[in-house]
């Protein structure tokens, strides 16, 4: 049978692509191409139910993580692509319900991220699973716990509650990462790390969008209000309406604003707002009847790939870049597209001179989808070089890594350019007026060979002015901006060094812990022989072996130590200070037990903003223990060591304007 043969082929395709998408985090085709295959498969299944092929959802959970069975299946959504299909879906749904009156929908953005299902028992997070195959997912609870603002404990909820949502990376964060093809893949790769410290550095975000049954909640819109009231992040961009013109107007509005939204959206989801109707509508084999996804059209165009050039990143990652014959897509002129890595280049067999299909679908960087082979004549296969295009050093590629790297970090001109570009960025020294072209010029002419040379440029003032394009005013403005940027906080200085895995958040925590540059640098210089300092770093909330290894690798190199010392001699590094009264400045806190009126994450933020430091384990160096309900062994240990105990109420009073929390000595050890 022809139908059976086609269904079998489509089924095998879906299995392969689901594995690439859900388990490998490296999809080979676009969402639009996947949707086309899946829609064709489902239509053939409906027309040939006797053939007995299964509906494909997700992919079995990886063996790397513990498995979690979902309370109810995590289904996918059927798609529509036009107003006509929307009207047809609404009418079909009303016929199913035998409903004559209007049917209200809640319209929400469809985030292009990674789905999760978090389970709470008696208000405490006990598991958090990926979609997996829709029935069983991977337990990523440790990684979810480090996502900023994700509740670990919640109050006033059913004894058993399952909250679902989407984890994503915003565009700004994605731009700081290397080696990922798009924000969705980066989010998936970050969320499925075996080391939560790496996840912590990636600044993942999330939106919660549904919950299991809650007494008294009757509408989807109320579910979002309920979740928001208990500390979950929900997307404020939504509309409740029963009118197709209003729904389409909202769809068009979000679509037009898509490029201004700081995260990827690939459509809207329309959900029947009345939760009582969800049970009546039930589900299809792979999707609920009470919801549908209205996908955005992708922006695509064909153009000639004129050249493949290699870009060298700050950490040495080599990225192939397609230089295109300029083409306008969605009102934007596109002349370049990332080819991501050597594997991607080989898999798609992309060659110089090819006619390629380019897509700009809300991603930060346009992507080359595929090659139009019918146009190809005698183009030669692109051979990925084994030498760095900037310094000619031999490139290396570690096992199980997609990235190819140049390890000549100190002598590779392009890496030095990117390192100094990082140093002068707004998040570091914030030196206005110095761009890539300026840095390249300074390096080429020998004015800069290391970061500290930026602050020695005034010695070359007269020489710089002799070159074409360098007028008196432009040179003086740059030198003035450099002079005005010499004063820098300790956390920004640490971040400016570009140490692997040391982002802004980690730099702040290190500054908070070590207070002054002298103290921090002394401790880092002796880190390889100082297990006490290593333990001190590991014990900081959100830190661990990954951060320690990065610091150890960096400061084990005497050239790096000399570079930091040289840079520090040309700037003024201010000690870490907190400007909220300073009442908790330098005080170390440990939490134990369950907080009732605020979440533990909120309490941590209160302490950090007031200059305090949150650590994970009890020692003689701890100043306070914040004890909630059902406090455990940490409370007993605190009593043994004579550490002051703070009740939740006392901490709340402090946030309302009181000074340092009143201390009390606990005698109980429950």
Swiss-Prot record:
Name its co-factor(s): Mg(2+); Mn(2+)
| Superkingdom | Bacteria
Q: Where is the BRCT domain?
A: 579-668
SMART domains, alphabetically? BRCT (SM00292), LIGANc (SM00532)
Write down the InterPro entries for this protein, in alphabetical order: BRCT_dom, BRCT_dom_sf, DisA/LigA_HHH, DNA_ligase, DNA_ligase_AS, DNA_ligase_CS, DNAligase_adenylation, DNAligase_N
Report the Pfam families cross-referenced here: BRCT (PF00533), DNA_ligase_aden (PF01653), DNA_ligase_OB (PF03120), DNA_ligase_ZBD (PF03119), HHH_2 (PF12826)
Active site feature: 110
Binding residues annotated for Zn(2+), in chain numbering: 388, 391, 406, 412
Q: Which reaction does it catalyse?
A: NAD(+) + (deoxyribonucleotide)n-3'-hydroxyl + 5'-phospho-(deoxyribonucleotide)m = (deoxyribonucleotide)n+m + AMP + beta-nicotinamide D-nucleotide
Q: What is its EC number?
A: 6.5.1.2
Q: Does the keyword Magnesium apply?
A: yes
Q: Which NCBIfam families match?
A: dnlj (TIGR00575), PRK07956.1 (NF005932)
Q: Which family does it belong to?
A: Belongs to the NAD-dependent DNA ligase family. LigA subfamily.
- Listed name of the protein: DNA ligase
């Amino acid at each position: 049978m022809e139908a059976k043969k086609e269904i079998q082929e489509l089924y095998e395709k879906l299995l392969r692509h689901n594995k690439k998408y859900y388990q490998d985090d490296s999809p080979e085709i676009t969402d639009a191409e996947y949707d086309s295959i899946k829609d064709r498969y489902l239509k053939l299944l409906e027309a040939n139910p006797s053939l007995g092929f299964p509906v494909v959802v997700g992919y079995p959970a990886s063996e790397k993580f513990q498995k979690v069975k979902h309370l109810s299946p995590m289904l996918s959504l059927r798609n529509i692509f036009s107003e006509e299909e929307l009207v047809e879906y609404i009418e079909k749904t009303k016929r199913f319900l035998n409903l004559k009156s209007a049917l209200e929908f809640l319209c929400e953005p469809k985030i292009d991220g990674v789905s999760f299902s978090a389970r709470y028992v008696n208000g405490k997070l006990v598991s958090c699973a990926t979609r997996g195959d829709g029935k069983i997912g991977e337990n990523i609870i440790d990684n979810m716990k480090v996502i900023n603002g994700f509740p670990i404990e919640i109050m006033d909820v059913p004894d058993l509650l399952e909250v679902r949502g989407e984890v994503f990376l915003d565009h700004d964060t994605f731009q700081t990462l290397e080696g990922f093809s798009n924000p969705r893949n980066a989010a998936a790769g970050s969320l499925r790390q075996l080391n939560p410290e790496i996840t912590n550095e990636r600044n993942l975000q999330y939106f919660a969008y549904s919950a299991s049954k809650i007494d008294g909640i009757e509408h989807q819109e109320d579910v979002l209000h309920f979740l928001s009231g208990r500390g979950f992040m929900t997307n404020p961009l939504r509309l409740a309406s029963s009118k197709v013109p209003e729904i389409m107007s909202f769809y068009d509005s979000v679509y037009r604003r898509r490029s201004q939204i700081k995260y990827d959206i690939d459509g809207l989801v329309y959900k029947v707002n009345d939760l009582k109707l969800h049970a009546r509508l039930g589900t299809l084999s792979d999707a609920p009847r009470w919801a549908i996804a209205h996908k955005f059209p992708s922006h695509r165009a064909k153009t000639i790939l004129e050249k493949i050039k290699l870009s060298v990143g700050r950490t040495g990652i080599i990225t192939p870049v397609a230089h295109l014959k300029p083409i306008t897509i969605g009102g934007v002129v596109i002349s370049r597209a990332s080819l991501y890595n050597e594997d991607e280049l080989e898999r798609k067999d992309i060659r110089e001179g090819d006619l390629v299909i380019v897509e700009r679908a809300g991603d930060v960087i346009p992507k080359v989808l595929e090659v139009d082979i019918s146009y190809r004549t005698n183009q030669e296969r692109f051979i990925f070089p084994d030498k760095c295009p900037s310094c000619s050093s031999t490139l290396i590629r570690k096992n199980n890594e997609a990235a190819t790297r140049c390890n000549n970090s100190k002598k590779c001109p392009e890496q030095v350019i990117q390192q100094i570009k990082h140093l002068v960025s707004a998040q570091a020294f914030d030196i206005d007026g110095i761009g890539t072209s300026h840095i390249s010029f300074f390096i080429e002419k020998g004015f800069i060979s290391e970061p500290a040379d930026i602050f020695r440029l005034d010695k070359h003032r007269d020489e710089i002015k002799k070159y074409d394009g360098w007028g008196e005013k432009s040179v003086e403005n740059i030198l003035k901006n450099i002079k005005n940027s010499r004063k820098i906080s300790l956390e920004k200085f640490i971040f400016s060094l570009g140490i692997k895995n040391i982002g802004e958040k980690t730099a702040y925590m290190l500054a908070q812990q070590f207070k002054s540059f002298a103290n921090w640098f002394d401790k880092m210089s002796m880190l390889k022989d100082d297990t006490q300092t290593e333990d001190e770093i590991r014990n900081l909330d959100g830190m661990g072996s990954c951060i320690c290894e990065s610091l150890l690798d960096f400061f084990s190199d005497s050239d790096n130590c000399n570079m930091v010392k040289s840079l520090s001699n040309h700037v003024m590094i201010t000690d870490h200070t907190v400007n909220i009264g300073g009442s908790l400045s330098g005080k170390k806190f440990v939490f134990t037990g369950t907080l009732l009126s605020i979440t533990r994450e909120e309490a941590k933020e209160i302490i950090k903003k007031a200059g305090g430091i949150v650590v994970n384990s009890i020692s003689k160096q701890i100043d306070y223990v914040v004890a909630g309900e059902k406090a455990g062994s940490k409370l007993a240990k605190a009593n043994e060591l004579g550490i002051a105990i703070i009740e939740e109420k006392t901490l709340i009073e402090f946030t309302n304007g009181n000074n340092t929390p009143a201390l009390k000595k606990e005698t109980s050890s429950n």
